């Protein structure tokens, strides 16, 4: 007899502690996307069990994880954590149901930017851009993420890979002879370009 995969919603503070289960959603849809940003939509009555969790102001941060189980323990799968980006409700709805829209955690890299002006090219056709020479995908991403972290930017932990090896411990392959990035480009756009050129894959966990 085959197993049935079940799912549930768990709320968290932004990059923080667990707020609790959300056991009575009206409905929800989710996409777990490899090498891209997935999405979550949830309808939930704030009069339902633990609905008060959704009274939080979005400015204080709210994340929802989608956990799954096939009858054993509950786990949060890869790409299963979502940052709630918007909330809406019908003021005339007596059930006080809110509609939440979330994007997977990798979306936060949109907020991390190439801002180091001290490393820009100062002459030639590429003046004003950031150059990487003889660099692999790990070196490029590690450099940008470390700079973002050290200046107090978006707190996304990418410590499992280095400039020498990916998160599985395998050495990076192709070395880019040279590549240039505009000032202000998001690290998400940098990552997308590396993925699209077959230089790396990514997921969140």
Name each model feature, range by range.
Residues 14-23, 71-76, 190-195:
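Short, solvent-exposed secondary-structure boundary motifs
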Residues 37-39, 79, 176:
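Surface-exposed or flexible loop/turn and strand-edge residues in extracellular/cell-surface modules
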Residues 21-29, 84, 174-178:
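A broad structural signal for short, well-ordered beta-strand segments within beta-sheet-rich domains
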Residues 1-60, 100-109, 115, 119-134:
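Juxtamembrane "anchor/assembly" segments of surface/extracellular structural proteins
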Residues 60-73:
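Short conserved beta-strand and strand-loop elements enriched in small hydrophobics
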Residues 70-102, 203-205:
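Short beta-strand and beta-hairpin "edge-sheet" elements
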């Amino acid at each position: 007899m085959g197993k049935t995969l079940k799912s549930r919603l768990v709320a968290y503070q932004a990059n923080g502690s667990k707020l609790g289960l959300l056991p009575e959603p009206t409905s929800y849809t989710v996409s777990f996307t490899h090498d891209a940003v997935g999405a979550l939509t949830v309808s939930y009555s704030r009069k339902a069990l633990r609905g008060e969790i959704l009274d939080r102001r979005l400015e204080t941060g709210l994340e929802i994880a989608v956990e799954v189980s096939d009858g054993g323990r509950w786990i949060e799968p890869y790409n299963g954590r979502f940052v709630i980006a918007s909330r809406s409700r019908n003021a005339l709805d007596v059930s006080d149901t809110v509609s939440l829209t979330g994007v997977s955690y990798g979306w936060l890299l949109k907020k991390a930017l190439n801002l180091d002006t001290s490393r820009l090219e100062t002459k030639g056709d590429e003046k004003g851009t950031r150059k990487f020479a003889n660099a692999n995908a790990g070196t490029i991403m590690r450099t940008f993420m470390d700079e973002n972290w050290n200046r107090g930017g978006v707190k996304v932990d990418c410590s499992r890979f280095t400039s020498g090896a990916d998160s599985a411990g395998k050495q990076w392959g192709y070395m880019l002879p040279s590549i240039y990035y505009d000032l202000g480009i998001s690290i998400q756009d940098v990552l997308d370009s590396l993925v699209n050129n077959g230089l790396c894959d990514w997921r969140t966990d």
